[in-house]
Amino acid sequence: MATATYTSLETYLGTSYEPDVDYVDGELEERNVGEYDHTIVQRAILIWFYLHEKEWSIRSLQEQRTRVGTTKVRLPDVSVFSRDVPIEQVFTHPQLIAIEVLSPEDRHYRVDEKIRNYIEFGIRHIWVVNPRTRAGWDCSDGNWVRQERFEVSGSPLYLSLPELFAKIDEEQVP
């Protein structure tokens, strides 16, 4: 059985990893990225919010390091920040929305752990999208609630999975 090697937070923050990794209590956790289905959906979500940045007064970023606790740094696949949140190299303020795009290798317990970290950090909207089944879940309260359209109450922000996947399908036609 392999033993994990402890890495200090300072070492992690001062090191570039390719691909980047989550930092959890001194251990580096690989993230499942790089497959086409994951990448194309992540890109489409990022573009969805990028096209509305001025209108909705937001910033959308992919795989942005976010310090979700004193010993935890996570990289949501897509983060949506209010423009009021100061820009930092490693964010220490909660984003408005954290979105995880599932890969076939993702395990439910690991995604649940990320969701718990996001909730404890104060992220109010946590959404999970499965590119293969085209299903989505609002996990903002820790439960997996199936959604086709995600909304941020009291604001114009939304993400429609049917619209998103229709745009992806249009791109796939030669």
What are these regions (language model features)?
Residues 1-174:
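Gly/Pro/Ser/Thr-rich low-complexity, intrinsically disordered segments predominantly at protein N-termini
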